[in-house]
From Swiss-Prot:
Cellular localisation: Cell membrane
SUPFAM superfamilies: Fibronectin type III (SSF49265)
Subunit structure and binding partners: The IL7 receptor is a heterodimer of IL7R and IL2RG. The TSLP receptor is a heterodimer of CRLF2 and IL7R. Interacts with CD53.
Residue positions of motif Box 1 motif: 272-280
Pfam family, one: FN3_7
Name used for this protein in its record: Interleukin-7 receptor subunit alpha
Residue ranges annotated as motif WSXWS motif: 217-221
Species of origin: Callithrix jacchus
Cytoplasmic compartment segments: 263-459
Entry keywords, A to Z: Cell membrane, Disulfide bond, Glycoprotein, Membrane, Phosphoprotein, Receptor, Signal, Transmembrane, Transmembrane helix, Ubl conjugation
Region of interest: Disordered: 327-357
Extracellular side: 21-241
Transmembrane spans: 242-262
Topology term for the membrane: Single-pass type I membrane protein
Length: 459
């Protein structure tokens, strides 16, 4: 009997286990059933329908049986404690204005009255923006680029205004080679030189919240396809202007190098690197004693730019010429005086023929001089052909004036009244023999010259 009772007990226990695994669990024994993986994810969208916000949740495992499961949110709500989601096929959705957007909320998966799993989330940090729209690409021929523009509904919204956009484009043949550009505006410029010519490209864009709100990337916008134009410039052709400039530049550089090599030692090196003086000569000049008798002038005139020299000759000549111009008559009178009572001239009278020079005192030419004595009684007057050229000096100027006055005085005492005292001008200049020369100066060029022969014949 004992063995039979034990056998029935084991069989009954196995029957309960088999019935539980096959799904025929009794009511109230649900907690003993095997639990499935109920992990889920949620995202929020703010101001999707006017001022209402939406919260969407879904199971990560698509094979989960969602027949008797519900979602419930509690906390961070306005005026209510909890809210239930409504089921739309495989997702659970709630739209309300009662999200506080500050603080955390508790989202739970419930099977009847029992909570299977829960998550603590903040609605403001799980925001998923709406997908951009109106994506277009315009080719600008003048700028050789493509202007990409798109639009988003968040530009007119109150909360999620700051977004970061991800623009992705690829060649049509490269399926997995996407190129991404991140920007905060809704315009993008693609340069033509970075794209392949005569090719088709696909482009799309998505957004993610920035600034205060955090969250996930939005869905991709609908793709847009555009084609790049063919490049008109052929690679084989070369611009002639650019070629000419390049050749001239190369020739100029070569010419400069040749000139630098040729003129390096003679012209360039002395200017860039001047030769240093010999140290021996420098030390010799430093150690050499200066001369004792230095020629130093303390005259203030030596420090002037223009040196002033004293000239007595010009001053004396001006004085004599001024004196003679005052005393010379317009024309010389020709007169002959003879000794009264005899044919032979008296030594005390002057010669019959008076010799004068044709030059006037206004010029700088030399005066004609006649050799003779101051007294006329024993010295004949020479002809003009043998007269000597006499120069007036500044040193004998005053002496000449004195002799002239003396000679005039002596002559006046011996000459008759017919000889005018101022009809002739006598100039005395010493000659080599130390005798004075008597010269009658006249201003008339037509006056006759008395030669030596006529003078002798008359005697």
């Amino acid at each position: 009997m004992t063995i039979l009772g034990t056998t029935f007990g084991v069989f009954f226990s196995l029957l309960q286990v088999v019935s539980g695994e096959s799904g025929y669990a009794q009511n109230g024994d649900l907690e003993d059933a095997e639990l499935d993986d109920y992990s889920f994810s949620c995202y929020s969208q703010l101001e999707v329908n006017g001022s209402q916000h939406s919260l969407t949740c879904a199971f990560e495992d698509p094979d989960v049986n969602t027949t008797n499961l519900e979602f419930e949110i509690c906390g961070a709500l306005v005026e209510v404690r909890c809210l239930n989601f409504r089921k739309l096929q495989e997702i659970y959705l709630i739209e309300t204005k009662k999200f506080l957007l500050i603080g955390n909320s508790n989202i739970c998966v419930k099977a009847g009255e029992k909570s299977l799993t829960c998550k603590n989330v903040n609605v403001a940090t799980i925001v998923k923006p709406e997908a951009p729209f109106d994506l277009s690409v315009i080719y600008r021929e003048g700028a050789n680029d493509f202007l990409v523009t798109f639009n988003t509904s968040h530009l007119q919204k109150k909360y999620v205004k700051v977004l970061m956009h991800d623009v992705a484009y690829r060649h049509e043949k490269d399926e997995n080679n996407w190129m991404h550009v991140n920007l905060s505006s809704t315009k993008l410029t693609l340069l033509q030189r970075k794209l392949q010519p005569k090719a088709t490209y696909e482009i799309k864009v998505r957004s993610i919240p920035g600034d205060y709100f955090k969250g996930f990337w939005s869905e991709w916008s609908p793709s847009y396809y555009f084609r790049t134009p063919e490049i008109n410039n052929h690679s084989g052709e070369t611009n002639p202007t650019l070629l000419t400039i390049s050749i001239l530049s190369v020739l100029s550089v070569v010419l400069l190098v040749i000139l630098a090599c040729v003129l390096w030692k003679k012209r360039i090196k002395p200017i860039i690197w001047p030769s240093l003086p010999d140290h021996k000569k420098t030390l010799e000049h430093l150690c050499k004693k200066p001369s004792k008798n230095l020629i130093v002038s303390f005259n203030p005139e030596s420090f002037l730019d223009c040196q002033i020299h004293r000239v007595d000759d010009i001053q004396a000549r001006d004085e004599v010429e001024g004196f003679l111009q005052d005393t010379v008559p317009p024309q010389l009178e020709e007169s002959e005086t003879q000794r009264p009572g005899g044919d032979v001239q008296s030594p005390s009278w002057p010669s019959e023929n008076v010799v004068t020079t044709p030059e006037t005192f206004g010029r700088d030419s030399p005066l004609r001089c006649l050799a003779g004595n101051v007294s006329a009684h024993d010295a004949p007057i020479l002809s003009s052909s043998r007269s000597l050229d006499c120069r007036e000096s500044a040193t004998n100027g005053p002496h000449v004036n004195q002799d002239l006055l003396l000679s005039l005085g002596t002559t006046n005492s011996t000459l008759p009244p017919s000889f005018p005292p101022q009809s002739r001008i006598l100039t005395l200049n010493p000659v080599a023999q130390g005798q004075p020369i008597l010269t009658f100066l006249g201003s008339n060029k037509e006056e006759a010259y008395v030669t030596m022969s006529s003078f002798c014949q008359k005697r």
